[in-house]
Structure formats: structure tokens, C-alpha cells
Amino acid sequence: MFLDYFALGVLIFVFLVIFYGIIILHDIPYLIAKKRNHPHADAIHVAGWVSLFTLHVIWPFLWIWATLYRPERGWGMQSHDSSVMQLQQRIAGLEKQLADIKSSSAE
């Protein structure tokens, strides 16, 4: 009789550990996003709960989404290439020349 109650207690304990373990596991992307001050941390948290109902299909994408952002560099997709800066300077110079030509022709 004692072993029946003990087995029932172990079964309930294992069920609770698995239940709360899955919940904690799905909060990992949110915790990463919160630590990195991610601008979409709330959306990642909600999507983590939605992934519980979608059989965890989107959970790996949430992990990637949470780890892509860093406050010091943003999304890491900005290109600070020198050629872009040179082109911007050339365009500014051409616009200045065009404005000078327009002002001289108006006189």
C-alpha cells in the first residue's frame, strides 16, 4: 500500500517537474531578450507562450530572434562601409554644385 502512494507521489512530482520545466524552457528566449534590452522582448515573450500551443515549432526561431539584437550594435546589419560614405559625400557635393548653378542662372 505504501508503495502505491509513493509511486503516485513520484508520478505527480515528475509531472510537475516536466510541466514547469517546459514553461521555464520556453521563457529562455524572453530572458535573453530582456537581458539584451531587446525592443521586441514582449513580443518574444508572447510568442514563447504561443509556441507551447504550436508544438514548439517556432521556439528555435524565437531563440534566434532574441539573440540577434545587441544594444551596442543594434541588429548588426547596418553597413558602415567607406564607399557608402564616399557616395554620400559626392551626392552632397553635386547637390551643392547644382544649387550654385541654379542660383547663378537665376541672376
Swiss-Prot record:
Residues 30-43 are periplasmic. It is a multi-pass membrane protein. It is found in: Cell inner membrane. Keywords: Cell inner membrane, Cell membrane, Membrane, Transmembrane, Transmembrane helix. This is Inner membrane protein YiaW. The chain crosses the membrane at residues 7-29, 44-66. It comes from the Bacteria. Pfam families: DUF3302 (PF11742). InterPro entries: UCP028770. GO terms for cellular component: plasma membrane. To E.coli YibI. Residues 1-6, 67-107 are cytoplasmic.
